[in-house]
């Protein structure tokens, strides 16, 4: 079920902006009803959460093979996938350099609040039952995990977070000397990130070429069918937010404040740094679960370990929301 959610006038001269979403409703709703709000990583659309090989697999139930959304919906959870502003079906401002993480977070928060209100009132599925006891979980991959953490630190909406392929380490080797000078200086990064993004790229929505993308997103051991399905979920990069996520420590203050259970999943061939160092970034969280996926790169859903990930995610959710 596709939705477009108005999120208001967030940038001068752009008018009202909207966020695109897909809502996957379970055939049998678990109790209490729980919605997962999922944000994709950089250079990906919300389609990352519902990868479908071409031609369509048979039998129909195997359509969930690479699909986080369908797998978790089959386990009784509502899954909502969102395109950040500038990506996929969401509004694309003319000056994409102004899409800072703070602007994106405001838009995401507005979209989540709107959809939650509809779910609680029973207005999503054409007269479905009101879900007054709805619980929510924030889910994000890579840059989307950063935005999910920032949303929770700002709004405190969710009962827990699931963060995939994410740490506060950034990608220091990919930075220029001027960009690297802001490492572990989140205030300075915020003040300068738009200027740095304009210096780094002439385009606010640059494309990642196919060979570079395959190396970053897939890598050794990725299932060919998943790699091919991922092509339909590829998008241009949001350069400002992408650069922000690459600068070490940029989102550390938000992570320090998170005081809810957190599920971390990283591949042993991921780009998030040493996995067992990541939980230390969440000192206020009462429970931090770390799952290290074997023989797995950055886009976890492309690898054989995805089935274990989907099952562990479901088990963790049961402990958090019951």
Question: Which stretches of residues belong to each language-model region?
Answer:
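N-terminal cap/lid segment of alpha/beta-hydrolase-fold proteins
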Residues: 1-31
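Short, surface-exposed "cap/lid" segments of acyl-processing enzymes
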Residues: 29-80
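Glycine-rich "HGGG/HGxG" loop immediately N-terminal to the catalytic nucleophile
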Residues: 47, 70, 84-99, 298-299
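Alpha/beta-hydrolase active-site loop
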Residues: 98-130
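Conserved hydrolase catalytic core segment
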Residues: 132-171
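Alpha/beta-hydrolase
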Residues: 176-269
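Conserved loop-alpha-helix segment in the C-terminal half of the alpha/beta-hydrolase fold
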Residues: 266-296
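Catalytic histidine-centered segment of alpha/beta-hydrolase-like enzymes
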Residues: 296-307
């Amino acid at each position: 079920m596709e939705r477009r959610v108005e999120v208001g006038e967030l940038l001068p001269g752009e008018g009202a902006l909207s966020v695109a979403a897909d809502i996957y409703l379970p055939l049998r709703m678990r109790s209490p009803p729980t919605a997962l709000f999922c944000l994709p990583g950089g250079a990906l659309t919300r389609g990352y959460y519902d990868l479908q090989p071409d031609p369509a697999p048979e039998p129909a139930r195997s359509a969930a093979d690479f699909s986080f959304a369908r797998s978790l919906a089959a386990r009784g959870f509502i899954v909502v996938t969102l395109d950040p502003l500038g990506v996929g079906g969401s509004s694309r401002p003319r000056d994409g350099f102004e899409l800072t993480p703070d602007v994106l977070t405001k838009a995401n928060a507005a979209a989540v609040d709107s959809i939650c209100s509809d779910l609680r009132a029973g207005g999503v599925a054409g007269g479905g039952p009101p879900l007054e006891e709805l619980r929510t979980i924030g889910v994000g991959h890579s840059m989307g995990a950063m935005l999910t953490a920032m949303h929770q630190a700002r709004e405190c909406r969710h009962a827990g977070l699931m963060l995939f392929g994410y740490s506060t380490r950034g990608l220091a080797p990919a930075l220029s000397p001027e960009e690297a000078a802001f490492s572990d200086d989140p205030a300075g990064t915020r003040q300068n990130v738009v200027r740095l993004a304009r210096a780094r790229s002439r385009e606010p929505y640059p494309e990642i070429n196919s060979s570079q993308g395959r190396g970053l997103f897939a890598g050794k051991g990725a299932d060919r069918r998943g790699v091919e399905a991922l092509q339909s979920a590829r998008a241009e990069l949001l350069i400002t937010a992408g650069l922000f996520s690459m600068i070490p420590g940029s989102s550390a203050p938000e992570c320090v404040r998170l005081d809810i259970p957190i599920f971390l999943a990283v591949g042993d061939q991921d780009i998030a740094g040493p996995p067992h160092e990541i939980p230390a970034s969440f000192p206020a969280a009462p429970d931090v679960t770390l799952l290290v996926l074997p023989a797995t790169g950055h886009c976890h859903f492309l690898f054989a370990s995805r089935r274990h990930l989907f099952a562990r995610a479901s088990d963790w959710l049961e402990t958090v929301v019951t």
